[in-house]
């Protein structure tokens, strides 16, 4: 019997050779890893907030607000990846608001924390220089308003683009391009501003003392600033890169999905297997890593341990209970920062550290007075000596 002739047309139904296949167990394992990482960060931040109450720090401070924002961010990411355990399809077909809340709003929260850090460190610089340049204090209100305005712009751009992607008939790539152009520019500018603030603080003598009293160092602050700016800059470059590649038609034949996955997964209506893997890696590198570093750096410390550890507090500086975001005993308002005191008034400002010096001086003077009194009462002994 003669074999039927080979017809290449019938091979069109075969799957493409270069299409990647992610085994189900790999996807399930990555989902478990992502969920565990975000859940652990959530538990760690929750413990930090509990320590704020435990050590009786201020309830409302830069530190507590920062931790609350990170806690909300970690909870949203944990909920997002928990959806992929049971229903992968449902996780890709959320309503517009749920899509924005789980995919886009965590990026907004991360930007809010970056803005908050800029606001605080800029205010620290103002207060450190306020004795010699009092006119700097008048810029505090414009600084607050500018930070609020930038945060609102970032929020509105993300919300509008997310709604248009899910409901409108607009070109998806155009919408994402607008979002990337505005939001990533703000990210990079805030990261650069943060690095400049940290650099200025590292050059200030009072700031160095303040960092040492917290148990950190200028090297740690510099490392955190450089890491943050590099991560956020590379994030913006990645988003621009995938936008450029997604417009090249002949690249689509490879169908690897990674060039279509932005940091908010808004370039694809359905996140495929490979796209899901890339999305998780993107969030790990540009969200989980910098947030974890900053949360750990600004964690709540035990004041009792700081008091018993002489290496944590320099002999020339701040009270050991001074922290980056709050002082649980002295600060009733931001105007009570110790840096508002001139250097010549350090003895009155940092009384806890200088009490020991005063006691040593008093004991020395007392001994000198005793010797002088003895020599006065017995002049013969003095002359014989």
Curated annotation (Swiss-Prot):
Induction notes from the record: Up-regulated during osteoclastogenesis (in vitro).
GO BP: autophagy; negative regulation of bone resorption; negative regulation of osteoclast differentiation; positive regulation of protein localization to lysosome; positive regulation of TORC1 signaling; regulation of macrophage activation
Membrane-topology annotation of the record: Multi-pass membrane protein
Compartments in which it is found: Lysosome membrane
All ranges on the Cytoplasmic side of the membrane: 54-64, 118-144, 195-222, 299-385
InterPro entries the UniProt entry points to: GPR137
Tissue expression summary: Widely expressed with high expression in bone marrow and kidney. Highly expressed in osteoclasts (at protein level).
TM region(s), chain numbering: 33-53, 65-85, 97-117, 145-165, 174-194, 223-243, 278-298
Lumenal compartment residues: 1-32, 86-96, 166-173, 244-277
Main localization category: membrane
Keywords tagged on the record: Autophagy, Glycoprotein, Lysosome, Membrane, Transmembrane, Transmembrane helix
Glycosylated residue positions: 11, 260
Gene Ontology cellular-component annotations: lysosomal membrane
Entry function: Lysosomal integral membrane protein that regulates the localization and activity of mTORC1, a signaling complex promoting cell growth in response to growth factors, energy levels, and amino acids. Interacts with Rag GTPases and increases the lysosomial localization and activity of Rag GTPases and thereby regulates mTORC1 translocation and activity in lysosome. Involved in the regulation of lysosomal morphology and autophagy. Also acts as a negative regulator of osteoclast activity. Involved in interleukin-4-induced M2 macrophage polarization. Also acts as a negative regulator of osteoclast activity. Involved in interleukin-4-induced M2 macrophage polarization.
Family: Belongs to the GPR137 family.
Quaternary structure and partners: Interaction with RRAGA; increases RRAGA recruitment to lysosomes. Interacts with MTOR; this interaction is amino acid sensitive.
Name this protein carries in UniProt: Integral membrane protein GPR137B
Protein species of origin: Mus musculus
């Amino acid at each position: 019997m003669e074999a039927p002739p080979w017809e290449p047309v019938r091979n069109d139904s075969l799957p493409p050779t270069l299409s990647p296949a992610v085994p189900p167990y790999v996807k399930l394992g990555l989902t478990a890893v992502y969920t565990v990482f975000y859940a652990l960060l959530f538990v760690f931040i929750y413990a930090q907030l509990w320590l704020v109450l435990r050590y009786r720090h201020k309830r409302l401070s830069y530190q507590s607000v920062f931790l609350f924002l990170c806690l909300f961010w970690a909870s949203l990411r944990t909920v997002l990846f928990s959806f992929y355990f049971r229903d992968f399809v449902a996780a890709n077909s959320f309503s517009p608001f749920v899509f924005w809340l789980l995919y886009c709003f965590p990026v907004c929260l991360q930007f809010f924390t970056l803005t908050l850090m800029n606001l605080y460190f800029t205010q620290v610089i103002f207060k450190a220089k306020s004795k010699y340049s009092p006119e700097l204090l008048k810029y505090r209100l414009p600084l607050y308003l500018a930070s609020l305005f930038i945060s609102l712009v970032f929020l509105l751009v993300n919300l509008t683009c997310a709604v248009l992607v899910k409901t409108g008939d607009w070109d998806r790539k155009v919408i994402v391009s607008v979002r990337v152009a505005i939001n990533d520019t703000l990210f990079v500018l805030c990261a650069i501003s943060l690095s400049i603030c940290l650099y200025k603080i590292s050059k200030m003598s009072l700031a160095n003392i303040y960092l040492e009293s917290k148990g950190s160092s200028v090297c740690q602050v510099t490392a955190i600033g450089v890491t943050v700016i590099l991560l956020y800059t590379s994030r913006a470059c990645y988003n621009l890169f995938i936008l450029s590649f997604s417009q090249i038609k002949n690249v689509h034949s490879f169908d690897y999905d990674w060039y279509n996955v932005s940091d908010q997964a808004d370039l694809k209506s359905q996140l495929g297997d490979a796209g899901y893997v890339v999305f998780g890696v993107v969030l790990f590198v540009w969200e989980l890593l910098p947030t974890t570093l900053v949360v750990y750096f600004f964690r709540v410390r035990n004041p009792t341990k700081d008091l018993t550890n002489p290496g944590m507090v320099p002999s020339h500086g701040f009270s050991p209970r001074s922290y980056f975001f709050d002082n649980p005993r002295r600060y009733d308002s931001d105007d009570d920062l110790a840096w508002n005191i001139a250097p010549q008034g350090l003895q009155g400002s940092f009384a806890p550290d200088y009490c020991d010096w005063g006691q040593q001086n008093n004991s020395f003077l007392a001994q000198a007075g005793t010797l002088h009194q003895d020599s006065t009462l017995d002049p013969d002994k003095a002359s014989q000596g």
